[in-house]
Amino acid sequence: TQEDIQNSGAKTAFDAVSNVPGVTINSFSASGADFGGMDSRTNIRGLDRGALVLVNGIPMNLNGKSGIGAIPTSAIERIEVVKGASSTLYGAEALGGVINIITKTPSKEGGSATVAVGNRGSKRFDLSYGTDRFLFGIDRKYWGAQDPSTPVRYDYTGRKGYDYYTTRNKGNSLGVFMSGKLSDKVTLNYNRAESRSSFGLISTETNPMRQAHHSTTYNYKDDRNNVSLIYKDDNTTGTLFYNDRTMRGESRVHSAKQFKPTDTSYVARQYGMDVQHEWDFRGGKDYLIAGITGKQETYRATQAPVYTRPHRNTYAVYSSYSREINPKWTAILGLRYTAISDPIKDQHVLTPQFQVLHTINKDSSMYLNIGKAYTMPSLSDAFRSVNRQYTAVSGKNLKPEEGWNYELGYKRMNKKDSWKVDVFYMDFKNFFQWQPDANGRPTVRVNGGKFHN
C-alpha cells in the first residue's frame, strides 16, 4: 500500500519491490538506474528475466527489460505482486510472476516537494502536484563518481595479457510522470525516464602508454517513454499503449582523443492494445473474464554497419472462469491462446491455469495454483553483431522458454498484521543460454537445459 511504501523509505518503485519476500533486485547503478546496457533487474523466485512488470496493467517489459528505477514513490498508489506462472491472464514473460505498479490518479488538489543531499555527490529533488483532474510528478537524481571498489577482473584465458578493474563515473537520472482524467471513464498516463551514466574499464598495467591503450571509458544516454490510454467502466477495460527505449552509447580508448559510437546502440518500440470484459453469474457468485490483446515489438540497431529491423507480432485471446462451489470453496480455470509471428520462428502457445481457493475464516485462507507460462527471446538476442555485421544468429529451432508452476499456500490478513507461507515447485524447459560464435563471443542464443526451483 501507499502507507507501506512511505514507511519503508523507498524512493522509487525499484526500491519498493525489493521489500517484497521472494522478489530480488540487482542494479549496476545508483537508485536502480540502468547503467547503459547493464540493466537493472527485477526477479521473482530466483528466475532471471522471469518477472513481467506492469504499470496500471500496461506491460513495461521492452526487449526483455523493465526499468522501474525512474518511477518515484510519490507517483505510486500501491504495488501488486502475483507470484507464480501467470501467462494465462498476462501473457509472455510472467514465468516467475507479475509486478503491477498502480500509479495515483487525480483526486484532489495538493502537492509535495522533497530535497535530499548525501555523500559521494548524491542529490535528489522530487516534486509532485495534482488536482481532481490532473497529476504531475518529477524526480531528479544525481550521483557522483566512486573510487574503484570492484575486484580486479583477471584475464584467466591469457588472451589479453593484462587485468583490469571497473570504475563508476558521475551521472544523473530524470523521471517525469503525468496522469490526466479525460473523462470519468478515460485516463491518459505518460511516463518518461532519462538516464546518463558513465563507467570505465581500467587496465592494471603499470606502463602508462600500455595502460592508456587498454583502458576504455563508456558513456550512455538512455531514454524511455511510456504512454497509455485506459478506458474503464463497471465491466469493461480497454487499453492502448506505446513504449519505446532509445539507447545511445559511445566509448573512448584512453590513448585516443575522441569518443566513437558503440555498436550496442539501439531503438526498441512496442505498440499494443487489450480489451477485456467481465460477466457476473448467480448473483455475483461466479464470474467470467474474457479478452483479446495484440502488440507489435520492433528493434533497430542504430550504429551497426548493416541496419536490422526485426519485429514481432503477438495476438492472443484469453479467459478465466471463477466458480463458487460453496461459501468455503472456489475454483478458477483459465486458458490463453497466443499466436506469435516471429522473425526466427512463428509460435503457437497454449497456457492453462487452475486454482482452488479455500476460505478458513474471515482472516485466513488456503490456495492451490497450477499454471503454465512462457517467454520469447528478446529481438536483440536473436539478432546480434557478428564480425560487425548484424545478422540472425539463432537457429530456426529456437523455442520459447516455457514450463509449469505448482503451488500450495496459506495466508492470513487482518488489520494488525498479514503473513503468507507457501510451498512451490517451478519446472521450466528450453532455458535460454548463450553459445559462442565462430569468434568465440557468446552471441548465439540457444535453448539450453532446464530450470527447477
Predicted segments, located by residue:
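Periplasmic-side early beta-strands and strand-to-turn transitions of outer-membrane beta-barrels
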Residues: 116, 128-220, 430
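N-terminal periplasmic accessory domains that precede
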Residues: 13-16, 40-43, 54, 66-67, ...
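Short strand-turn segments of transmembrane beta-barrel domains in outer membranes
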Residues: 104-129, 164-170, 399
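Outer-membrane beta-barrel signature, preferentially recognizing the C-terminal barrel domain
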Residues: 118-120, 213-234, 266, 345, ...
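Extracellular loop and loop/strand-boundary signature of outer-membrane beta-barrel proteins
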Residues: 63-64, 110-114, 157-166, 203-219, ...
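Extracytoplasmic beta-strand/coil segments of soluble accessory domains associated
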Residues: 14, 18-58, 77
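Short acidic/polar hinge/loop motifs at secondary-structure boundaries
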Residues: 41, 58-83
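Face-selective signature of the C-terminal outer-membrane beta-barrel domain
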Residues: 135-136, 181-195, 219-352, 357-359, ...
